[in-house]
Each structure stands twice: as structure tokens, then as C-alpha cells.
């Protein structure tokens, strides 16, 4: 009778989608009776298991929705004097406090130096900390927003972008901007200014960004909001793609 009661309880847990709790309860039931914890301890174990399970699912969903270019982690980042990146700097950024302060990160450097990989790693770290992250190639994002104007989804997508705890804009400066793209970019930056963090990666030095935007008033507005509260990383050294075998950047 007790075994039947236990199985019914297990079925109810699964029916209520308490997957973590059900898995832990099943593990407890497989133990010898004299090793099974008392009811109060068991309840605490089951609740903890369910909490861990839901946090894990939430994190995995956030990582999937972010659509990172690379599956990267901060532990895999190569820090050296030659790269102009120290482990101390990386550790400070990895704690995520810049996100809480609404600060930006600008990662610049030549092609193949690991800009996108570093941005992906910081984004992945933010997801692990329970934050909402979105990763975009800037040219593709701006093209998508043009299409949104035609099908009526522009406002919805802009609101989603605005509310991300961390927005990553990769490939800044890779494609020229037209008037519509400049205005969309300005709106993105303005909506997030002083509230949410943005990571930008670019082959262009910051000194060239004004001419890249190519419209004085809009360039002034965008750059004032991006650069004012930005942590700058200029990666150096040879391309890491040449001799890379473990996708470690």
C-alpha cells in the first residue's frame, strides 16, 4: 500500500510538471528504507531539487533564445599581455555588475582576434546569472528591422530588444548605414541608455565611428550614449583562427 501511495505521489508530481522534484523523489524511493530521509528533510530536498531544475531550464532557454555566435565561456578566454586582455579585467566584467549599472562594453580589434568569442562568453555568463540576453549581427538586425516596418512587427521587436538586460551588437561597422538604419540604431541606443547594458564588437577603431555613421547629429547622439559609460577592450595580436584547434579565443 505504501509503495502504491509513493507511486501515486510520483505521478502527481510529474502531472504538475514538477520534474526536478519528481526525479529527486524517485531517487529517494530507490534507496533502502532505513536510508531514506525523514519527511521534513525529504520535503526540503525535493523543493531544492525542483528549484535547481527550474533554474537550469530557465538558463538553458535563455542561452538558446540569445542565439550566440559561439558556445563560449569566460574560462576558455585566453588572457595575455600580447592580447591586451588581463584575467583581472575579464573577471571584473564576468561578475556582471556592469549590467546592473547599465554600462556598455566596446570590444575592438582586427579580424580573427576573438571579439565575437569574447562577447559570446560574456553573454553566456550573463545568462548563467539569470539575465536576459540577445545577440545580433548589427547588419542583419538592421535589415530585419526594415522588414519589420513592412509587416507591422517593428514596434514589437524594438520593445523586446529594449528590455534585454544585455544586448550584444556584433559586426559594428561591417556594412554602411542608410537613413532608416541610422534612425533605428539611434532608437535602440536611446531606449536602452542608462538602463540596460550593450556590448559592441567592431573592427573599426572608435575614432572612425563618427564617419561610419555619416550624419553628424545622429552620430553625436549615438556615440555620446554609447561611449560615455563604456568599458573598452582593444584586442591585439595575430588572428587566433589560424592555429585554433579547440575554438579557444
Name each model feature, range by range.
Residues 56-108:
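Extended interfacial segments that mediate partner engagement and assembly in macromolecular machines
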Residues 49, 125-129, 191:
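Active-site catalytic microenvironments for nucleophilic, acid-base chemistry
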Residues 1-11, 243-249:
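Intrinsically disordered, low-complexity and often Lys/Arg-enriched segments
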Residues 166:
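Walker B motif beta-strand of ABC-family P-loop ATPases
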Residues 85-163:
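Conserved P-loop
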Residues 14, 18-69:
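Interdomain "pre-motor" coupling segment immediately N-terminal to P-loop NTPase/helicase cores
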Amino acid at each position: 500500500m505504501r509503495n502504491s501511495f509513493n507511486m501515486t505521489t510520483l505521478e502527481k508530481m510529474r502531472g504538475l510538471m514538477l520534474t526536478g522534484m519528481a526525479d529527486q523523489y524517485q531517487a529517494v524511493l530507490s534507496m533502502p528504507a532505513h536510508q531514506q530521509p525523514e519527511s521534513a528533510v525529504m520535503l526540503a530536498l525535493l523543493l531544492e531539487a525542483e528549484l535547481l531544475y527550474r533554474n537550469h531550464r530557465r538558463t538553458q532557454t535563455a542561452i538558446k533564445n540569445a542565439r550566440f555566435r559561439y558556445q563560449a565561456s569566460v574560462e576558455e578566454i585566453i588572457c595575455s599581455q600580447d592580447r591586451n586582455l588581463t584575467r583581472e579585467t575579464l573577471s571584473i566584467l564576468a561578475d556582471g555588475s556592469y549590467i546592473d549599472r547599465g554600462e556598455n562594453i566596446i570590444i575592438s580589434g582586427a579580424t580573427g582576434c576573438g571579439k565575437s568569442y569574447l562577447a559570446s562568453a560574456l553573454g553566456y555568463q550573463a545568462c548563467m546569472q539569470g539575465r536576459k540576453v540577445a545577440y545580433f549581427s548589427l547588419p542583419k538586425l538592421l535589415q530585419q528591422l526594415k522588414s519589420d516596418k513592412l509587416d507591422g512587427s517593428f514596434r514589437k521587436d524594438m520593445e523586446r530588444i529594449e528590455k534585454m538586460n544585455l544586448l550584444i551588437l556584433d559586426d559594428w561597422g561591417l556594412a554602411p548605414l542608410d537613413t532608416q538604419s541610422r534612425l533605428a540604431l539611434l532608437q535602440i541606443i536611446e531606449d536602452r541608455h542608462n538602463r540596460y547594458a550593450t556590448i559592441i564588437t567592431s573592427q573599426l577603431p572608435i575614432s572612425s565611428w563618427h564617419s561610419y555613421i555619416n550624419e553628424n547629429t545622429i552620430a553625436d547622439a549615438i556615440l555620446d550614449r554609447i561611449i560615455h559609460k563604456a568599458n573598452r577592450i582593444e584586442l591585439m595580436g595575430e588572428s587566433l583562427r589560424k592555429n585554433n584547434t579547440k575554438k579557444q579565443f
